[in-house]
A protein has these predicted regions:
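Short, structured secondary-structure boundary patches
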Residues: 62-64, 80-85, 106-109, 140-146
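A generic structural signal for well-ordered alpha-helical surface patches
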Residues: 71, 90-93, 107-111, 137
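Flexible C-terminal active-site loop/helix
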Residues: 118-151
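Catalytic alpha/beta core domains of metabolic enzymes, predominantly
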Residues: 1-93, 98-101
Length: 151
């Protein structure tokens, strides 16, 4: 934390910080309490987005198969609809959690992007893993339960 604050103090052009060192909400709060000219973004797949927003983060910068959901959460929160933002966030948490599985996050996200027409191929280069049939079935089940297009 001190290093980030020292860097920000040394160079006035450094105004935006992306936090990915857990726990992000209290760290964001401490950074912003020390320097209110900073803009802090969360990361880590959006897992702590609501808590980061509550601590003063301006948004998140992360990969996610449905980025429009994260945009909706941030817009609601920033417009004053904190309850609506929280409801959307908690409704989507199972997908955020599922997509953030270590080593599987990129193949899961690429499969979602392919199904949504954003990319042509979901293949992950070596040494990245491939998704097994069970993981794909779990993803399909989750997307169906959330009412999100899976194909």
């Amino acid at each position: 934390m001190d290093l980030l604050l020292d860097l920000a103090a040394a160079d006035p052009r450094l105004r935006v910080i992306k936090l990915e060192d857990e726990p992000t909400p209290p760290k964001a709060g401490r950074l912003l309490a020390a320097d209110q000219t900073l803009r802090v973004l969360g990361g880590l797949g959006g897992e702590m987005l609501i808590e980061e927003l509550r601590r003063g983060c301006v948004g998140t910068m992360t990969g996610f198969g449905y980025p429009e959901i994260l945009v909706d959460i941030v817009r609601r929160f920033r417009s004053g609809d904190r309850e609506g933002a929280t409801i959307v966030f908690h409704r989507t948490c199972p997908l955020i959690r599922f997509e953030n599985q270590a080593a599987l996050n990129l193949p899961i996200r690429k499969l979602i992007y392919q199904r949504r027409g954003a990319i042509a191929c979901a293949h992950v280069r070596a040494p990245g893993p491939s998704l097994d049939a069970g993981t794909v079935a779990d993803l399909d089940d989750l997307l169906g339960r959330l009412g999100l297009a899976s194909a």
